[in-house]
A protein has these predicted regions:
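Bacterial signal peptide processing site
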Residues: 16-20
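Short, well-ordered beta-strand elements
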Residues: 28-42, 59-65, 156-162
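Short, polar/charged alpha-helical segment
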Residues: 40-60, 78, 172-176
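Ligand-binding pocket segment of bilobal, Venus flytrap-like solute-binding proteins
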Residues: 74, 83, 160-227
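A conserved helix-loop-strand patch within extracytoplasmic ligand-binding domains
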Residues: 105-160, 258-262
Length: 294
C-alpha cells in the first residue's frame, strides 16, 4: 500500500529494538508483540490495536516497526516472535494463493480463511479498505468518465501513470475487462508524490492511487468506479499467530474492525501525513471517538 516516510518520532513512540527479537507466546500467555510495516498507515493501525488490547486488559503490549517483507512477517508469526499484524485481505490472499481470482470483499475474506496455513488466523475484517483506484482530473470526469467502463473507449487517447509493476499485473486484465489500451503507460511511483504531480500537471491523465490517499480530495481528483471489480478487495484485517490472544483480546480487535471505515482511515492518514500528529494521540482519539475505551 502507499509508502510514507516514517519520522524518527514514530519509531520512538512505537518502541525500539529488533521487531523479531524475543516475543514469546503472546497475549494468551505473555507479551503481545504487534508488527507494523514501514508504511504510516500500518503503524497507525498497530497503535490502535495496541490501545484496544491494553484496554481489554493486556498487560504487556509492544508495537515494533518495521518488520520487513511479508515473508519475514509470516515467519515471525509462525515462531510467535510476533503476535499480530494489521494487513490487507487481498494482498494476504494473493500471498497464500497466487492463483486466486476472488475480487469482492466477502469472497476474498472467505477464501483467505480457507487458504491460511495452520498456526494462523485472521480476525474480523473491517469495512475500511486501502485499495488501488484509478483516478482522473475533474475535466475528464466532467466529460462523462465516471467508471472504468466509461474509461475503456477513451484509453487510446490517454496517458496512464502508475508503479513499475502495473503493466505486468493489470495491462492485460484492464484490456480484457474494459477494452482499455492506454496510449502510453508511464512509470511514476506507487501512489506517491510523483504520481500526484504527474496527474496535476497533465503529464498523465489517469493514475493509480490508493483509496485512503488524502491527495485525492486535496487535489480535486475523481476516483473512477471499478464496475467489474478488476482490483481485488483490500479490507483491513488483523493477521494473528493462533493462540497468542485471549478471547477478550480477540473481541477487542474485532470491535476495532467493526468501527473502522474507509472514511475514518483516510482521516487518520490526513492527521498523520498532513497534520503531523503523534500516532499515539491519533490512536487514542480514534478509540475514544468510537467508544472503544472503557
Amino acid at each position: 500500500m502507499k509508502r510514507l516516510v516514517l519520522l524518527v518520532v514514530l519509531v520512538l513512540a512505537a518502541g525500539c529494538g529488533n521487531p523479531l527479537a524475543g516475543g514469546g507466546e503472546g497475549g494468551a500467555t505473555g507479551d503481545i508483540i504487534i508488527g507494523a510495516s514501514d508504511v504510516g498507515e500500518s503503524l497507525l493501525l498497530a497503535q490502535i490495536y495496541a490501545g484496544a488490547l491494553r484496554d481489554a486488559g493486556a498487560a504487556n503490549v509492544t508495537v515494533r516497526p518495521p518488520v520487513g517483507s511479508r515473508e519475514v512477517v509470516v515467519k515471525a508469526l509462525q515462531d510467535k516472535s510476533l503476535s499480530v499484524v494489521p494487513d490487507y485481505s487481498g494482498n494476504l490472499l494473493r500471498y497464500f494463493d497466487k492463483d486466486t481470482t476472488a475480487t469482492k470483499p466477502q469472497d476474498v475474506y472467505a477464501q483467505l480463511r480457507q487458504k491460511l496455513p495452520a498456526g494462523f488466523e485472521v480476525l474480523d475484517q473491517a469495512p475500511a479498505e486501502d485499495k488501488d483506484l484509478l483516478v482522473v482530473g475533474p475535466q475528464l470526469a466532467a466529460s462523462g468518465v465516471k467508471t472504468f467502463s466509461d474509461l475503456g473507449p477513451r484509453c487510446r487517447e490517454l496517458v496512464f501513470g502508475g508503479p513499475g509493476q502495473w503493466s505486468s499485473r493489470w495491462k492485460d486484465k484492464i484490456k480484457a475487462l474494459y477494452g482499455c489500451e492506454f496510449k502510453e503507460i508511464r512509470t511514476t511511483d506507487t501512489g506517491g508524490p510523483v504520481t500526484v504531480a504527474a496527474l496535476k500537471s497533465g503529464d498523465v491523465q489517469v493514475a493509480d492511487l490508493f483509496s485512503t490517499s488524502s491527495t485525492i480530495a486535496a487535489n480535486g481528483f475523481v476516483p473512477l468506479v471499478d464496475d467489474k471489480n478488476m482490483f481485488p478487495a483490500q479490507n483491513i484485517v488483523p493477521l494473528v499467530a493462533r493462540g497468542t490472544l485471549s478471547p477478550a483480546e480477540t473481541a477487542a480487535l474485532n470491535r476495532v474492525s467493526a468501527a473502522l471505515t474507509t472514511e475514518q482511515l483516510t482521516r487518520l492518514n490526513v492527521e498523520f501525513t498532513e497534520e503531523k500528529r503523534n500516532p499515539l494521540d491519533i490512536a487514542e482519539d480514534f478509540l475514544a471517538r468510537n467508544h472503544l475505551k472503557s
